[in-house]
Amino acid sequence: MRRSTEFGVKTAGGSMTTIFERIIEGAVECDKVFEDENFIVIKDKFPQAPVHLLIIPKKHIEKLQDMQSDDFSLLSEAGKIIQLMARDFGIENGYRVVINNGLEGGQSVFHLHIHLLGGGLLGSIA
């Protein structure tokens, strides 16, 4: 038996499958703009800017704080994808890159992901 939550599905055993894992598996439709062996990039369903993409590693890592030493190369790969997406979406002149880490950091889906926002003048956050 599965019980749905806002951001994933809880199995009878209590383990959580996030919405991102279900997207990666192809079980949930999304607006995918890029995919390779390690990442999928989708348009955010609730955009906070004219361009709002989510760069999601296929490897399940709950949050940035949980990364192991062999995971850090994913951040370098993500940087290259961010540059590519910025070019492809015409936001090279300015964009914001955000990782929300943990509940207090505003993370709502507990599968590491990077927000890429742009396409207009973004308000200050600091």
UniProtKB/Swiss-Prot annotation:
GO molecular function, one term: catalytic activity
Chain ranges for the short sequence motif Histidine triad motif as given in the UniProt record: 111-115
Signal peptide: none
Xref: SUPFAM superfamilies: HIT-like (SSF54197)
Domain of life according to the entry: Bacteria
Annotated HIT domain residues: 19-126
Listed InterPro entries: Histidine_triad_CS, Histidine_triad_HIT, HIT-like, HIT-like_sf
Pfam short name (any one): DcpS_C
UniProt protein name: Uncharacterized HIT-like protein TC_0664
Lineage, opening ranks: Bacteria, Pseudomonadati, Chlamydiota, Chlamydiia, Chlamydiales
